[in-house]
């Protein structure tokens, strides 16, 4: 993890450590180590390290985990330098939906040890959901990851290999599979929407951005040290890149358009429809130049 940060990556960690018992101290003491590592290791040469931890909503340590960024309480259980997200399952949300319709509905939620699968405690799903919403209002976190929905959207040529999504990245922008052989890697960039009118008519702009990101990914594959071999293997097999956006509010301000107006909504739709279409076209151009990624090629996808 520290090596990935030193190489310039923001890091997401799925914490599947078993709950506290006579052999394990649970999740929080280990997260304190990552919390300290944020200060001890830089992200490349630009800024301090930054990590995000993800925990399943049925983990026995979920309550302590949810509250780890609160400024008050036991400092041994606080990790203020570490970001965090909770993996919410369909089963959990069905309980919440049922409880919203019927206040007397049974919302019993089993917390299970991730290794033995033994039920450690039964709690109220409503109480956990309420805690999540309150903490998001107070601290802005935890991130919410609908993990079952993410896995349903995983391309079949990855899921057929037995690969599964266990969490997200530093800022919950992407969902890539991880395994004992793979540490997910994605090369990201953002388009500045403040200057949308300058580049949206340039047919080469987004394809060039995509080729640039793929070049950066290739540089990582060619130069990554052996200590991050799983990350290099994942990058080689999947060649994942991602394009986001920033500056939408600045664009609206420059046009004196209210952000909650119908016009702003229409502009937002037009911008992101354009980006989606151009990314699809850029993907085809990149594939014609360099061929499909190995995972897709193995699945017979041209």
Regions picked out by a protein language model, each given a short descriptive name:
Residues 17-21, 57-61, 150-151, 271-275:
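Acidic, glycine-rich active-site loops and adjacent beta-strand->loop/helix elements
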Residues 25-32, 60-61, 83, 87, ...:
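Conserved active-site and cofactor/substrate-binding residues in soluble primary-metabolism enzymes
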Residues 1-23, 27-30, 41-44, 135-235, ...:
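Function-dense linear segments that define catalytic or interfacial modules
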Residues 13-17, 48-52, 77-85, 104-115, ...:
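Short coil/turn segments at secondary-structure boundaries
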Residues 208-232, 236, 257-302:
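Internal maturation/activation junctions in enzymes
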Residues 21-100, 230-231:
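Domain-level cores of phosphate- or acyl-group-handling catalytic modules
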Residues 67-68, 74-139, 147:
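Polar, glycine-rich mid-to-C-terminal structural blocks
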Residues 20, 41-53, 72-77, 111-123, ...:
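Inter-helical turn/loop segments and adjacent helix faces that build the functional surface
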